[in-house]
Amino acid sequence: MLRDRDDNLLEHDKFIRDNIRSTDILIVSVGANDIALRPTATTIARMLQMAWLTQFHSIENRSAYALPYFKDMFGTKVQSYVSRLTSKTKPRAVVVCMIYFPLEWEKGQTSWANAQLKALRYDSYPEKLQMAIRQMYEVATRKIRIEGTQVFPCALYEPLDGKNKEDYIDRVEPSAEGGRKMAARFVEILEGIV
């Protein structure tokens, strides 16, 4: 969870911080579990507000009331986390990922996250959450900068766009094929760097 790192790095984060080399490339994908797995009461309120009380055009034009909350989560907090991971040694590059789209609903699909996806209206109106994720990428992930290294934003929703069930397990986890598509995107982003 990203919020578990607000004040202190976890042990495996400290391992990265203490062992990363200047020739390494760091790929960071955090924040999804703060929304889907164990959200805070505030996160739940903001997600439900976005899903049920916000017009699509307000998300699209970035005037949605809840958007600054997620801009802070996926922008300011992720940047702080990456800065602390790279505080001892700056890697060659950092790839910062925005979450992928969950698999869109079809009859008969099962998932541990079905209740959460339904509460977010993803089963009936996936375009709304997808637009919110796109906007969070634009206003947060794409703006992350870490002094002393190159930062490359990565929209994981491009290779995992919620349309192909072969890319997912339980609607919210990448399958082997989904993982292959994400890896191909990383290679594409880093072409010319490595």
For each of these PLM feature ranges, what is it?
Residues 104-154, 179-183:
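Substrate-gating cap/lid alpha-helix
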Residues 166-194:
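Histidine-centered active-site loop/cap adjacent to the catalytic His
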Residues 73-95, 132-155:
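A structural motif corresponding to the C-terminal end of an alpha-helix
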Residues 13, 71, 75, 79, ...:
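Short, amphipathic alpha-helical "lid/cap" segments that border enzyme active or binding sites
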Residues 3, 34-38, 102-108, 161-164:
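Short catalytic/ligand-binding loop motif for oxyanion handling, primarily in non-cytosolic enzymes
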Residues 1-73:
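Conserved SGNH/GDSL esterase-like catalytic core that processes O-acyl groups on lipids
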Residues 97-101, 155-158:
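Short, well-ordered beta-to-alpha junction loops that form the rim of enzyme active sites
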Residues 1, 149-167:
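Acidic carboxylate-rich catalytic motifs and surrounding loops in phosphoryl-/glycosyl-chemistry enzymes
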